[in-house]
Design a protein with these regions (language model features):
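Accessory/regulatory regions of helicases
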Residues: 365, 388, 392, 549-639
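Nucleic acid-machinery interaction/catalytic patches
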Residues: 1-568, 625-631, 635
């Protein structure tokens, strides 16, 4: 199997040669560069002057005069502007979610070069001057008409009044916010993108050639950026696709574009591929394809040892399987821990590259217990702690590991019915003295939490020599928690975050509960365990995808937004159709070069899972030329 990155490395070396020092290779994400560098080194028996590797977001950051704003600070700055413009009395913790949403909308506005004044104009004005919108095509005009049919300005309700009132302020908030951020020398990503595009001078760029590899959906800024560099003779483009989904007609009624190939076809027309079409006909080549239904999520994880043995056995003796040619792709990241527990000992190396919910780690429950202890669990008027808050801390595994007195103290408090113990009763060793010292003020609370996390770090340092995959994961969760709390502490100490301790409690809990750990290992070694997004540009010989259910791929529902769907569509912004097409591309692109493909889905209906296979599986079942084996898991055995 020849991978896409191998093809690119081979072609680029033939065209440019050994000296790639004046070349920047741009990927959608940084991960692919590690694989690519290995393939590039194989092209020559002599030393190669290495190119620069950069992700698209890093490239725009390098070209921007501003620093990337800390996400928490960005919301805090928006909160100040929001209160000034609306005279709202909303608290920061109530605003925080809406603030993230608004920044996401502004980000999309800028990345798609939307005229913010027109978008956020008074809705009545927008309706009145709709006919003058020459920049809209017929489809966009229809989207605006549908919006006003469904959203009658004349029929006012309390909810509509609130929406219209806020909408009329969004333009002022947008401009005021961007002005304030520029004054501070920081920006959100879309603001950087727009500025770089508007001020771009290709002849002043650092590198002679910019090689764009493996992109799919492009926003307006990226498209314009690519065009400017192509016109300046500085750009090369490598697109990955398969003729199966760029040529496939549906019901013989052209024009029809397969969902997975919709954006690639647009890109190929504007930016021709450096590679010939002949190398992109692999999806129709012989493959072993299996669809397996499972009764539960965990049953899929327990099937892994059998799958690993089957792909190892299938290989010929003269071509033994390499672990890095095997990939376990999780459509549901909550399956990571069951999957790690299920990997057999014969797998020597495992590399995890995916986001994992911080809320599913021991560090999260420990920090949450400490926050409750020092806020709602401590009565400042009596100087006593609440028993339930104390018990949660004493029973936690981290406390038991760091304190020899914790277990005995917990039993004593229970036996003596000490429902409101004094701090002095609880300080029975050095660690417990740190834990049960009351903290007042938001800065003191954050400092306390970082000190506690440093104590926990000692535990993981002691176990570091074992190189256990779970310890690696928990160390990442510790670092993520420490970084997040320390960022808040810096904002507080710099006077940029001035809130009540109860607001800080809710804000901390919200931030920790919604955070993901960006877990990164050594990608060029071992079996790969990853999420769907992390598979971009990578190819694997043996592939298993878990939780390939409708609702998991593509994810159920669209992203929340202040900007209604029809207006997003009319102004050329990102919509749910874009995201579904992106996931369709990820699915087909991942399968196209694999030789052994096993797709599992859960038949139980719970949460996001509807108990049915993903639409992409159904589509592949109907359209693909392969004979697909349909099986089911029963008591851990495939039947």
């Amino acid at each position: 199997m020849q991978t896409f990155l191998q093809l690119v490395a081979q072609d680029l070396y033939q065209k440019i040669g050994n000296d790639l020092s004046r070349v920047a290779i741009v990927f959608p994400n940084k991960r692919a560069s590690l694989f690519f560098n290995e393939y590039l080194a194989m092209q020559s028996d002599r030393p190669i002057w290495s190119p620069a590797y950069v992700s698209i977001s890093e490239l725009f950051r390098q070209l921007s005069p501003w620093k990337s704003g800390d996400p928490i600070r960005l919301v805090c700055e928006l909160y100040k502007v929001f209160r000034e413009e609306t005279r709202s009395e909303e608290t920061l913790d109530d605003f925080y979610f809406w603030g993230e949403l608004l920044i996401s909308d502004f980000d999309d506005v800028d990345k798609n070069l939307v005229d913010a004044d027109r978008l956020f104009s008074n809705l009545q004005d927008l309706k009145n001057i709709m006919d003058d919108y020459n920049f809209l095509d017929s489809e966009q005009e229809e989207a605006i008409r549908q919006f006003f049919q469904n959203f009658s300005i004349e029929r006012r309700t309390q909810l509509k009044e609130k929406f219209i009132s806020l909408w009329d302020k969004l333009g002022d908030i947008y401009h005021h916010y961007r002005h304030n951020l520029a004054e501070l020398g920081i920006a959100y990503e879309g603001m950087m993108y727009r500025y770089v595009m508007e001020e771009l001078q290709p002849d002043k760029l650092k590198y002679e050639h910019y090689v764009f590899v493996g992109f799919n959906v492009l926003n307006k800024v990226e498209t314009k950026f690519f065009e400017r560099l192509r016109e300046a003779g500085k750009a090369l483009f490598y697109w990955d696709y398969d003729v199966f989904y760029t040529r496939l007609p549906r019901e013989n009624t052209p024009p029809y574009t397969h969902e997975a190939g919709e954006f690639i076809l647009r890109n190929l027309k504007i930016f021709p591929n450096e590679l010939p079409e002949a190398v992109f006909d692999t999806l129709r080549k012989p493959k072993n394809v299996r669809f397996i239904s499972a009764p539960t999520e965990n049953a899929q994880a327990r099937y892994l040892p059998e799958w690993i043995r089957s792909v190892t056995k299938r290989d010929l003796p003269e071509t033994p399987v390499k672990e890095k040619e095997n990939a376990v792709v999780l459509c549901n990241e909550a399956l990571l821990l069951p999957v790690l527990h299920s990997i057999p000992s014969e797998v020597k190396n495992v590399n995890i590259t995916m986001g994992f919910p911080l809320a599913q780690t021991p560090v999260y429950s420990f920090v949450s217990a400490l926050i409750e202890l020092q806020t709602t669990g401590y009565h400042r008027d009596t100087g006593r702690y609440q028993y339930e808050a104390v018990q949660s801390v004493l029973k936690h595994p981290h406390t038991r590991q760091l304190s020899t007195s914790a277990e005995g103290l917990e039993k004593q408090l229970t036996r003596d019915n000490r429902f409101f113990p004094l701090p002095s009763e609880l300080k029975q060793d050095t660690f417990l003295e740190q834990v049960f010292t009351p903290k007042t003020g938001i800065s003191a609370l954050c400092q306390y939490l970082t000190e506690m996390l440093r104590e926990v770090a000692v535990l993981y340092q002691q176990e570091q020599e074992t190189d256990d995959i779970f310890n690696q994961l928990y160390r990442e969760s510790l670092f993520k928690s420490y970084t997040l709390i320390n960022r808040l502490l810096n904002l507080i100490d710099n006077g940029e975050l001035n809130i009540q301790i109860e607001t800080l409690r809710r804000l901390l809990c919200r931030l920790l509960a919604t955070s993901n750990i960006p877990f990164h290992g050594e990608p060029a070694i071992g079996m790969q365990v990853m999420g769907v997004l992390e598979t971009r540009n990578l190819d694997f010989r043996n592939l298993i995808m878990l939780s390939l259910n409708e609702g998991q791929l593509p994810k159920a529902g669209g992203d929340s937004s202040f900007i209604p769907y029809n207006l997003r569509k009319a102004f050329g912004m990102t919509t749910i159709e874009h995201k579904n097409a992106v996931y369709a591309y990820y699915f087909y692109r991942l399968i196209q070069r694999a030789e052994n493909v096993t797709l599992l889905y859960n038949t139980a209906s719970e949460g996001l899972n509807r108990g049915e296979m993903s639409r992409f599986m159904l589509q592949f079942l109907v359209e693909s030329p392969h004979t697909i084996s349909r099986e089911y898991l029963e008591a851990g055995t495939v039947r």
